[in-house]
Amino acid sequence: MPDELKPHFANVQAHYDLSDDFFRLFLDPTQTYSCAYFERDDMTLQEAQIAKIDLALGKLGLQPGMTLLDVGCGWGATMMRAVEKYDVNVVGLTLSKNQANHVQQLVANSENLRSKRVLLAGWEQFDEPVDRIVSIGAFEHFGHERYDAFFSLAHRLLPADGVMLLHTITGLHPKEIHERGLPMSFTFARFLKFIVTEIFPGGRLPSIPMVQECASANGFTVTRVQSLQPHYAKTLDLWSAALQANKGQAIALQSEEVYERYMKYLTGCAEMFRIGYIDVNQFTCQK
């Protein structure tokens, strides 16, 4: 990879290394920090998060003994589920020190004999052949200018029959917002600025066509795009309710300012999904 492509460590750590204990106040026990999949209405958040992981992994055609690369592995739930359910070897990449330490503990406590590695590194620093790639909730941090480099690397790492499952929030182009009759308000614009400056520094959302075009330009065929839009609104509602229920602990761990900022982020994003300004999609990319 070109020397100038350095991973965005500072931007990612500014959010994800806030405090594991703080995130545990509103995430489910698997600590999965992405859209859940409520296959049934009566599912708990934990059940729905595992269902989402299974939905993603089920699109990869995993076979025992394969090696799966998890780009942006979070606190390790997808990696460990893949090992347990599909009997594969896993490599996880994260830019968060806290997440890397947590996954190291999961790996150390696992009795499964498959190879399990977590690297405090970005995809820009990875160059080992793998059989399948999954990336859930990381693409939003890459930046538009790196999409081609990412898809090019993924294509190079995968075998001839390789598959990548990319799960990412997607945004509408202003033209699409206008065409759908959605209001373009200063409130919406201000909220977006708040998200990319105070919650996810450097974050940029792709559009669906942007992902499809970059994938195709780098040798992939996008065989399926699945939207989970209503599922993210529900996930965010459950997160904000849990954080609100733990307000005292949240303030003790951080501050009232951080608590209010996160409540604004969680409730505001839920509304953005409900209105339709943003979506979340799983892209199945076949080599």
UniProtKB/Swiss-Prot annotation:
Supply the Pfam families for this chain: CMAS
Picking any one GO biological process from the record gives: methylation
Cite the entry's keywords alphabetically: Cytoplasm, Lipid biosynthesis, Lipid metabolism, Methyltransferase, S-adenosyl-L-methionine, Transferase
Q: Coiled-coil segments, which residues?
A: none
List the GO molecular function terms: cyclopropane-fatty-acyl-phospholipid synthase activity
State which Enzyme Commission number(s) the record gives.
Answer: 2.1.1.79
InterPro entries per the record?
Answer: CFA/CMAS (IPR050723), CMAS (IPR003333), CMAS_actinobact (IPR047672), SAM-dependent_MTases_sf (IPR029063)
Q: What is its main location?
A: cytoplasm
Q: Which GO terms describe its cellular component?
A: cytoplasm; plasma membrane
Q: Which residues form the active site?
A: 269
- Functional summary from the UniProt entry: Catalyzes the conversion of a double bond to a cyclopropane ring at the distal position of an alpha mycolic acid via the transfer of a methylene group from S-adenosyl-L-methionine. Cyclopropanated mycolic acids are key factors participating in cell envelope permeability, host immunomodulation and persistence.
* Membership in a protein family: Belongs to the CFA/CMAS family.
Q: Relate the assembly described in the record.
A: Homodimer.
The name under which this protein is listed is Cyclopropane mycolic acid synthase 1
